[in-house]
UniProtKB/Swiss-Prot annotation:
Membrane topology: Multi-pass membrane protein
Primary localisation category: membrane
Family membership: Belongs to the G-protein coupled receptor 1 family.
UniProt KW keywords: Disulfide bond, G-protein coupled receptor, Membrane, Receptor, Transducer, Transmembrane, Transmembrane helix
Listed Basic and acidic residues bias regions: 322-341
The protein's name in its UniProt record: G-protein coupled receptor homolog U12
Gene source species: Human herpesvirus 6A (strain Uganda-1102) (HHV-6 variant A)
GO molecular function: G protein-coupled receptor activity
Presence of keyword Transferase: no
Gene coding for it: U12
Length: 347
């Protein structure tokens, strides 16, 4: 969603040509390409993963993090649809009213906060499960309560962001924009940016890294061979998360620094828009990497899909297996009889 800053009608006055530079046009084309790729790949992957995990829980017991991972993918699914609506509106393919713009922007920030925070919570739960040294299956009631509290907290954090959203009334296009028209609103907007930089960037990275590093060290100290697959999974998980989050934190800090010292120049406007463009892409990259890392790494999803298939189609599998066994036994008998006939033939 584009940001329109108009401080007492002075900032950006007469700078309409700044938004049509070749650099910004190229950046917007690249953003559209990346968004299209993530939308077309992430949504089908998330549907496959969530469906498989839900069906698997009907035939097998769940572990401590199962429901949390399912809600993580569900929030990623909602987030990608919010990205879709925001993209088609930004390209002016559809016009929205102010309420729908605020609703989409609110849901986007709420589920994004929930998704990134859930990654850190899953890390803490795995750490607790490891150190209790016993089977720790979370009760449905406590799991639901924790998910509800996190969802409520994420929604409360997202409320201030929706207050800045309006439709671009100057051009009458129905395009959703973050509109700031006073110095107090600008200061509040900057404060909200700082809070979300901490919620989306610093805090999850610290919690995630701390608990997974300890988790990895504990498994390595027990025996590396026994937990070789788990160690590989945790290392891939940690590496992929840090490769996204560390540049993300750096870009968030740069954006806050630029917004803290606004300038009425095309160069300043171009830098801020490019930073905001990259920031918009980072949650999409998380939504793309989460199914790949959490589900498709290590073959766990394949095993669960096979278990679901065997559970829902047992008769077919049994008859197929029996047919294979009978064919194999018949083949062995034919081989033995042929060998005996050849043995009894005269030379």
């Amino acid at each position: 969603m584009d940001t329109v800053i108009e401080l007492s009608k002075l900032l950006f006055k007469g700078n309409a040509s700044c938004t049509s530079t070749p650099t910004l046009k190229t950046a917007r084309i690249m953003e559209s390409a990346v968004t299209g790729i993530t939308l077309t790949t992430s949504i089908p992957m998330i549907i496959i993963v969530v469906t498989t995990m839900i069906l698997y829980h009907r035939v097998a017991k769940h572990n401590a993090t199962s429901f949390y991972v399912i809600t993580l993918f569900a929030s990623d699914f909602v987030l990608m649809w919010c990205v879709f609506f925001m993209t088609v509106n930004r390209k002016q393919l559809f016009s929205f009213n102010r309420f729908f713009c605020q609703l989409v922007y609110f849901i986007y920030h709420a589920v994004c906060s929930y998704s990134i925070s859930m990654l850190a919570i899953i890390a803490t739960i795995r750490y607790k499960t490891l150190h209790r040294r016993k089977k720790t299956e979370s009760k449905t009631s406590s799991t639901g309560r924790n998910i509800g509290i996190l969802l409520l907290a994420s929604s409360m954090c997202a409320i201030p962001t929706a207050l800045f959203v309006k439709t671009n009334g100057m051009k009458k296009t129905g395009k959703c924009v973050v509109y700031i028209s006073s110095k107090k609103a600008y200061e509040l907007f900057l404060a909200v940016k700082i809070v979300f930089s901490f919620i989306w960037g610093v805090l999850p990275t610290m919690v995630f890294s701390f608990f997974y590093v300890i988790f990895c060290k504990a498994l390595h100290d027990v025996t590396e061979k026994k937990y070789k697959k788990t160690l590989f999974f945790i290392r891939i998980l940690l590496l992929s998360f840090l490769l996204i989050q560390i540049p993300y934190i750096a870009i968030l800090i740069c954006e806050i620094a630029f917004l803290y010292m606004p300038q009425n120049t095309c160069f300043w406007l171009a830098r801020v828009e490019i930073l905001q463009l990259i920031i918009r892409l980072m949650p999409q990259v998380h939504c793309f990497s989460n199914p790949l890392v959490y589900a498709f790494t290590g073959g766990e999803l394949r095993n669960r899909f096979t278990a679901c298939f065997q559970s829902f189609f047992p008769k077919t599998l049994c008859s197929t297996q029996k047919r294979k066994d009978s064919d194999a036994s018949e083949h062995d008998q034919n081989s033995k009889s042929k060998a005996s006939v050849e043995k009894n033939q005269p030379l």
